[in-house]
Amino acid sequence: MKKYEITDIAHPDNPNLHRIRAVTDLTEDVLAGMLGGYVESCDNLDQEGRAWISEDAIACENAVVCGDAVLTDHAVAKGCAYVGKNATVTGNATVQDDAIVCGGLLTGKSCVCGYAVIRQDEQTLCAPIIDGSARVYGEISGNVVCRGNAVVLPGTKLDNRTQDCFVLEDDRVSVQTASRTPPPKEPCTYAFER
């Protein structure tokens, strides 16, 4: 069953791109009849799952958006990019080339490109946040934040399976420790009625 159709509404700057329209209710926010973002062809947005392209976001060329992924605002997926699972690409963020994004949040003017891989850690369920003007060419998974003008070069792999957050900001790296509940100062005793 189809979840969307491609309309005749062309993008103002690129006539090869057309708005989509939901033909069925997908989520509480995406109801039948609502207009979405732009695609170049029906291959850009999977008809299965709850993936959606909204506002002025674009998926074009051979890029694929699927699963429960969301492209919104002015985000762009292009080239042979893959955006899936529960990834959110928003703001003016771009996923391009052969990059794979399977979870996490891309926002600001960030760019995930080349053969980059961004994914949620399956054990901790933590997912990367790429923000600002950060550029990622390597692999990132787990509880990692890249922001500012941070650059993750090709061949670099950041895999954080802890609850602590690794933060790459501009040319600095830091760790934000997860707040932990301190042990009780005195042992707990319970009074039971008899």
Features from the language model and the residues they span:
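Terminal amphipathic alpha-helical/low-complexity segments used for targeting or macromolecular assembly
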Residues: 1-50, 56, 68, 74, ...
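Residues at the loop-to-beta-strand transition
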Residues: 43-45, 51, 57, 63, ...
